[in-house]
Amino acid sequence: CPSMTVRENLSLALNKGKLLNLRKCLRYKRDFLENLLEGVSLDLKKYLDVQVKFLSGGQRQSLSLIMSCLTNPSVLLLDEHTAALDPKTSNEVIELTNKIVREKNITTLMVTHNLKHALHYGDRLIMLHKGEVVLDVKGKEKEQLTVEEILEKFEYAV
């Protein structure tokens, strides 16, 4: 919620699914919440008492990602979650995504038009065109692909 602080948003996310008022949610100690944000490269730790509406796009995306993974979901759906970010921030958010997904072992479906990200992250790459699967690779085959080869396969398929 943009009008709430980072701390308030994290506290609510930690209590997802529980019928608690905000005051009870805020029982989480500052050091606990700071520890949650440890290692997040966009300095979110310094902004615990700042309203979300004052954060940068990358900070908001990082906060959303962290909040969505606090309750250990079985599946995480990401739809172009770095598309509106500058390249540097996009890389920071995608690295945070990779770290969280790997540490928590969360099955993730990531939609992206960034072919480098599509190649580098994840165990399987599925490319669609007009709702049809035109490429489905995993394992060694995926590891050996280049961006240029993906583009060639796409052009051949369409």
Pin down the residues of each PLM region:
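Helical segment within the ABC ATPase nucleotide-binding domain
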Residues: 91-103
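Q-loop/switch helix immediately C-terminal to the Walker
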Residues: 4-16
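Catalytic Walker B motif of ABC-type/P-loop ATPase nucleotide-binding domains
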Residues: 76-79
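H-loop/switch region of ABC-family ATPase nucleotide-binding domains
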Residues: 112-113
